[in-house]
């Protein structure tokens, strides 16, 4: 992993409105065309969630927590519904409204970090679905001394028995003093903007699901402190996910369970934004969900709903993953 640099003093955020776009440093932006493959990922996540809550609402009211859900519950959406979902996603809104405000230096404890955190909270609070927003604030020992961190946790219906949890990190990598400003577009502003676009595009549908008390709900995690501050290692990385996973493990949820046990499926989005991304299945337990995403990609291709997509399957690849990945999923995986 990359090595970092010296920390920056924490300064008060100015008088700028939380929803006003910050003035980022000069940089080369990602071409919009390169974001279209990432919008596919938002599409697939949206479609999987539609499938889950539509099927589970009618079939799993009495299913005990902890019991895995099997293939018969994974249905297929009608073509008209697929096209409607695709039509609700807006790449221009993704770019201008959600991504641009995130393209600032946002290392832990910096003014940009706090500003982005408040932007995430404020944006989620504007949605009509009525998300329950929590801030997991904590101070951790780091190679640079004690630093303040904050995870943003958005849960559509906190009372639902199960959570489909989508996660990303919003902090950017710290580089030595004098380096060019690093805003971490792919690492990981784009994933954060994808989750915001997903929540906005499905705002009405998610609100309806919440009203009828569907047994599975959507949860979004915006994690702080993923990046190492000096050198990647177990004591210098994943600050936010380690703290939140520990907190969820010790927090009751329903009868005889904890918040981490309520997570039925955990999907981490990171390092997205470059052209032609590829994804591999890393865990046998979630292989069926990976193949579901692969099937959705094929279906979107056959329906001619994808741009710059000459082959039936480009992104969700079969075979062994080329490398193992240490990322924010690890603290949750260890407690599963």
Feature map (PLM): residue ranges:
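Secretory-pathway/membrane protein signature
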Residues: 1-336
